[in-house]
From Swiss-Prot:
Endpoints of the signal sequence: 1-21
The species this protein was found in: Mycobacteroides abscessus (strain ATCC 19977 / DSM 44196 / CCUG 20993 / CIP 104536 / JCM 13569 / NCTC 13031 / TMC 1543 / L948)
Principal cellular location given in the protein's record: membrane
Topology term for the membrane: Lipid-anchor
Entry's family note: Belongs to the mycobacterial 19 kDa antigen family.
Lipid tethering residues (S-diacylglycerol cysteine): 22
Entry protein name: Putative lipoprotein MAB_4074c
One cellular-component annotation, GO: plasma membrane
Protein keywords: Cell membrane, Lipoprotein, Membrane, Palmitate, Signal
Keyword Protein biosynthesis in annotation: no
Location(s) in or outside the cell: Cell membrane
InterPro entries for this protein: LpqH
Length: 154
């Protein structure tokens, strides 16, 4: 029963993070978009299989930086929302790794995972630990995996 509550809470956190991450009070302005940015995505020290790295797109708009990708044959996907400031902060991150839906999120009184962002010119390196549940076996409990995402934006 507890695992069902955890999985349900993870889903609500992820949905809430997307809504919060995609909304703000700042004027929209013109978006800065870059794609095919030689992205690197590693989870647990390995390349994230099934992710179309050429499709990784970075959009700077309205005070946020949104990083997203397409999947190959519907396997994996990646979504990151971070603040567009001198020291960016990840507000939400979601990815699927080996059948597990993993996230970094902070909201509604709960914190899931952790992430740090380093900036070198137009290159953003996001490192941390994402937590979640195996969607094939949600009763197995929470899992946490280290990740590194490197993407060029601008």
């Amino acid at each position: 029963m507890m695992n069902r509550v955890i999985v349900g809470a993870m889903g609500l956190l992820a949905a809430g993070a997307v809504v919060v991450g995609c909304s703000n009070d700042k004027p929209a302005g013109a978006a800065q978009v870059s794609s095919g940015s030689n992205a690197e995505v590693k989870v647990d020290g390995k390349d994230l299989a099934g992710l179309d790295l050429k499709s990784v797109t970075c959009v700077k708009q309205g005070g946020n930086i949104n990083v997203a990708s397409a999947a190959i044959n519907g396997q994996q996907g990646l979504g990151v929302v971070m603040t567009d400031e001198a020291t960016p902060k990840v507000t939400s991150l979601g990815l699927v790794y080996d059948g597990a839906a993993l996230a970094v999120s902070e909201g509604m009184g709960a914190k899931v995972g952790s992430a740090d962002v380093k900036v070198d010119g137009k290159t953003y390196t996001i490192t941390g630990e994402a937590s979640g549940a195996d969607v094939k076996n949600p009763m197995a409990g929470m899992i946490t995996k280290p990740f590194t995402i490197k993407v060029s934006c601008g």
